[in-house]
């Protein structure tokens, strides 16, 4: 592909679409980031940045955060709603609430809060879904509007802490997930002398589509049915506390790809709001929950990895539906709240790491089978002769199916001793050579060739062994088949020489990325430029800022990676700050209740028993360094 261009690379990885202008490919084929979206002309090369970090002692893999992207996402979302409110003459305001479950890292939460620090009236609050999250939020919310929303199941301690938050000056909304929570809230509020701010999570009949659709619908784990909502109203009236019901909440699920689902959910919840107001409730806030999606594959579609709407359309739909409904039922317009954590955080973080080795199929010369070889082998040789153009052509699809069938039968005969090891090896080599020739002969412009091309790409793909743990750094890729954009960080000015799959360094066959963004679709392999030990390149995993860190596990005892915060200063200089060391071997041993100190004593006993005296000090030093070392491979330089 001598006419390969940078535009071809951008289209191949679809980077201009999934990145929303935050990441790109430079004219010299290097992946770049615009760390401050307000200055898109200021770009940083990720490849050189990673190499500089390594030189300064930060080993790969490293998770890099760009806090100015967080600021931009917060302000963009607030601006979209502010403009929609003005457009539809909505008679209230908008509040963005960050659910810290999406990414509880202190750096992330503080940077999100800092994005509104210069606003006269901050449009930002925090959400907690558990006691530990609430304890964090109580301390951090003072830097925002001091609005706190408490979701999740609650015991007496959780409820008391939330009420204490009210005494501390916060506006704490306790959202009732179960009807039994109401009694505890009222009892503890009376004991503490606090007037509670109550919210209701309603269980909608409508259920959105997607991987998290179980968050909504009549069988949802959370929320109150219509009958239970009426029970709450009755109980509050009896206690003369109906004015305490200030918030209505619903949640369709994370990553809602279709704007119609969002519109329909808001419409049904809006009817709940109007009915509650008719019953005398004092609902001031309408909380649409999460659902604002991230376009992971850049296709702007209804795929579970994508979204068929933009930020403006999202805000316009919510505001317009509520405007029309409140006017129709002559009800006041409530403050609109959204809990859009995935949208805020996904783009701000990228994992950078090295390839430690590759395994690729290289065509080898093959000889015809012996005359007395089984007929199956002669059949396979005939397929090779025909596909290589040395005999009359048959349909390429027929050759493929025949050769695959013959190889399957060879394997069966080997299992029962009718074919030897050398014959099996020969058959496998012929099959690979046939597949290799077919891959170059078939064309995607023929629809009936496409499924076989996909199968051949997967069968002949290079294996890239990458220095990371899928289970630690991209758990959703393993757990729910989530797609994350993956790109080589350099060499993209050259045409791809092969297709590859990315394998992690865990001892688990599931540690493989199975889906890749490729053009306007998803493929099982990734186009890559040539990689050699003499001319290696790094790999970037993008849009990993939401959920991945907190969901990551320590399979094979691979721990947290190193991380760093990178910021662009006023003079457009790159500042690497807040470098946080990843887990050491001793750290992860402690997590599973293994005592590194006692291990060291055991090593000393073994060294004294088995190692010559002049070697003991060096061996002990290596063992000690092993405990202090990074859990990932450290050979890259």
Curated annotation (Swiss-Prot):
Pathway: Amine and polyamine biosynthesis; agmatine biosynthesis; agmatine from L-arginine: step 1/1. It is an enzyme of class 4 (lyase). The modification N6-(pyridoxal phosphate)lysine is found at residue 101. Keywords: Decarboxylase, Lyase, Magnesium, Metal-binding, Polyamine biosynthesis, Pyridoxal phosphate, Spermidine biosynthesis. HAMAP family: SpeA (MF_01417). Belongs to the Orn/Lys/Arg decarboxylase class-II family. SpeA subfamily. This is Biosynthetic arginine decarboxylase. It comes from Shewanella halifaxensis (strain HAW-EB4).
């Amino acid at each position: 592909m001598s006419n390969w261009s940078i535009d071809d690379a951008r289209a191949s990885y679809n980077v201009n679409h999934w990145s929303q202008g935050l990441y790109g490919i430079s004219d010299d084929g290097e992946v770049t980031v615009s760390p401050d979206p307000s200055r898109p002309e200021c770009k940083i090369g990720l490849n050189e940045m990673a190499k500089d970090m390594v030189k300064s002692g930060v080993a790969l893999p490293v998770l890099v955060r760009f806090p100015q992207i967080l600021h931009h996402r917060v302000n963009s979302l607030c601006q979209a709603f502010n403009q929609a409110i003005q457009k539809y003459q909505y008679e209230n305001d908008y509040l963005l609430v960050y659910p810290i479950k999406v990414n509880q890292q202190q750096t992330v939460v503080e940077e999100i809060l800092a994005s509104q620090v210069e606003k006269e009236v901050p449009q930002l609050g925090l959400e907690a879904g558990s006691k530990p999250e609430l304890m964090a939020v109580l301390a951090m919310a003072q830097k925002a509007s001091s609005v706190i929303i408490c979701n999740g199941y609650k015991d007496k301690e959780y409820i008391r802490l939330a009420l204490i938050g009210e005494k501390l000056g916060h506006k704490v909304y306790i959202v009732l997930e179960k009807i039994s929570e109401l009694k505890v809230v009222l009892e503890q509020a009376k004991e503490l002398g606090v007037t509670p701010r109550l919210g209701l999570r309603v269980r909608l009949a409508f259920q959105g589509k997607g991987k998290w659709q179980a968050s909504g619908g009549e069988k949802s784990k959370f929320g109150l049915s219509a009958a239970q909502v009426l029970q709450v109203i009755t109980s509050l009236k009896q206690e003369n506390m109906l004015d305490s019901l200030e918030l209505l909440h619903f949640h369709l699920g994370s990553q809602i790809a279709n704007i119609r689902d969002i519109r329909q959910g808001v419409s049904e919840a809006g009817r709940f709001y109007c009915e509650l107001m008719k019953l005398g409730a004092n609902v001031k806030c309408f909380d649409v929950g999460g659902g604002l999606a991230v376009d992971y594959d850049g296709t702007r579609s209804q795929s579970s990895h994508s979204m068929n709407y933009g930020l403006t359309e999202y805000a316009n739909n919510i505001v317009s539906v509520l405007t029309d409904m409140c006017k129709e039922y002559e009800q006041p317009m409530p403050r609109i709240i959204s809990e859009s954590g995935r949208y805020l955080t996904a783009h701000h973080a990228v994992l950078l790491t090295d390839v430690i080795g590759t395994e690729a199929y290289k065509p080898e010369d093959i000889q015809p089978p012996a005359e007395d070889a089984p007929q199956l082998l002669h059949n396979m040789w005939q397929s090779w002769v025909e596909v290589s153009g040395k005999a009359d052509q048959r349909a390429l699809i027929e050759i493929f199916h025949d050769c695959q069938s013959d190889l399957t039968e060879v394997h069966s005969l080997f299992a029962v001793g009718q074919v030897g090891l050398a014959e099996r090896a020969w058959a496998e080599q012929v099959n690979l050579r046939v597949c290799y020739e077919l891959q170059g002969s078939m064309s995607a412009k023929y629809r009936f060739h496409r499924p076989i091309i996909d199968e051949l790409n997967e069968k002949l793909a290079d294996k890239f062994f990458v220095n990371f743990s899928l289970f630690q750094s991209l758990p959703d890729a393993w757990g729910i088949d989530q797609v994350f954009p993956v790109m080589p960080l350099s060499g993209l000015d050259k045409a791809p020489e092969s297709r590859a799959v990315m394998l992690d360094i865990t001892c688990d066959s599931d540690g493989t990325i199975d889906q890749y963004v490729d053009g306007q679709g998803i493929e099982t392999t990734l186009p890559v430029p040539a990689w050699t030990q003499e001319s290696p390149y790094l790999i970037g995993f993008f849009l990993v800022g939401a959920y991945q860190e907190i969901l990551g596990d320590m399979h094979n005892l691979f721990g947290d990676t190193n991380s760093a915060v990178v910021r662009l200063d006023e003079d457009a200089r790159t500042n690497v700050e807040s470098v946080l060391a990843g887990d050491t071997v001793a750290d992860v041993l402690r997590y599973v209740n293994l005592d590194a100190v006692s291990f060291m004593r055991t090593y000393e006993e073994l060294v004294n028993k088995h190692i010559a005296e002049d070697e003991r000090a060096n061996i002990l030093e290596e063992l000690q360094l092993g405990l202090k070392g990074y859990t990932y491979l450290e050979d890259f330089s």
